[in-house]
Amino acid sequence: MAEPVNNLIDLLLNDNIKGLKPYESARRLFSGAGNKQQVWLNANESPFANDFTIDAERFNRYPDCQPPAVIDAYAAYAGVQPEQLLVSRGADEGIELLIRAFCTPGKDSVLICPPTYGMYAISAETCDVGIERAGLNDDFSLNVDAIKAFKGKVNLVFICSPNNPTGTSVDKNQLLEVVEHFADSAIVVIDEAYIEFDKDNSWAAELTHYPNIAILRTLSKAFALAGLRCGFTLAQAPVIQALMKVIAPYPIPEPVAQIAAQALSSEGLVTLEQQVAVINQEKALLKSALAEIADVELVGDDKANFILFRTPQKSALMSHLVASGILIRDQSKQINLDNCLRITVGSPEQNKQLLSEISRFFTLQTSTQEA
């Protein structure tokens, strides 16, 4: 029966899905590694695992679509009004909701600025929405003129700041020029997943002035809750109301809402600040150590919780680290990132282990060359 079933699936499968490949998330790339791989530094997760309490009293009831405790707490944290906020299953769902709400399949397009986060393109492809590209400049700043040339051709402009994987923040004047240029034709989506590591560059305070911006946020990075899948879209009320038309009826499970509210409490925010400080300190130590290695070139900036670097020994180093139980992310397939690897800042112990293995690798390479 396998062949008839496969033929049926091929017959019924959505045409724009047929040529797609599943997104290679950091977790999927090493699926099945389990406990064999102890040091996960490939997904920009936090090294901290915080404790929370769960009340099961309401587990027999469907949850609120937009849990008030979470909405109110995050609105206060971000400095916006509750009606300017939508909570979703990670910022990734926010990306998909924006595309579904503001792009007509088979007709409209979005603009991305590579090298950047891959889910903008993946979500557009799965929704049968076109993808235009305006690559970043060599210094990873926005190519504003290239972006502006797409006015009237795209409905959404995705800009990641701080940018994954380059760690660079977008100049506010450049971003303002883009926002104003598309004021009557497109929504500019500013992905601030890493904004806790670059707080002074948030656009949240500008929401009231610019109706064509939407901001993506998450609890997955600095808040150390990647496993929770809880993200936010910040925008003026008409944008939020449009997203509410396409979001699922019960997107936020009750346990997720409870934990998110605790993470956003006054005590939770103190923990956040303390842990961000530790990560920033460890990031500086990692950068300093990597900069001393002859075959390593630091790339981009450090406005997030990761470090990007280039080495001609990229493949061999990656293989060595995997064999040593340390997983980092290969970014060399992205434009202008040849031979680049990305390291998530881990715990002090993880970072020491990483640096030890990197040092051992280059020592072995030198010994081999001398022999």
Swiss-Prot record:
Keyword match Lyase: no
InterPro entries linked to this entry: Aminotrans_II_pyridoxalP_BS, Aminotransferase_I/II_large, HisP_aminotrans, PyrdxlP-dep_Trfase, PyrdxlP-dep_Trfase_major, PyrdxlP-dep_Trfase_small
Membrane-spanning ranges: none
One annotated GO biological process: L-histidine biosynthetic process
Top-level EC class: transferase
Alphabetically ordered keywords of this record: Amino-acid biosynthesis, Aminotransferase, Histidine biosynthesis, Pyridoxal phosphate, Transferase
Pathway the protein takes part in: Amino-acid biosynthesis; L-histidine biosynthesis; L-histidine from 5-phospho-alpha-D-ribose 1-diphosphate: step 7/9
Co-factor requirement: pyridoxal 5'-phosphate
Superkingdom as given in the UniProt entry: Bacteria
One term of GO molecular function: histidinol-phosphate transaminase activity
EC number: 2.6.1.9
Catalytic activity: L-histidinol phosphate + 2-oxoglutarate = 3-(imidazol-4-yl)-2-oxopropyl phosphate + L-glutamate
Pfam families membership: Aminotran_1_2 (PF00155)
CDD domains membership: AAT_like
N6-(pyridoxal phosphate)lysine sites (modified residues): K221
UniProt family annotation: Belongs to the class-II pyridoxal-phosphate-dependent aminotransferase family. Histidinol-phosphate aminotransferase subfamily.
Classification via NCBIfam families: hisC
Subunit structure: Homodimer.
The protein, known as: Histidinol-phosphate aminotransferase
Species, as recorded: Pseudoalteromonas atlantica (strain T6c / ATCC BAA-1087)
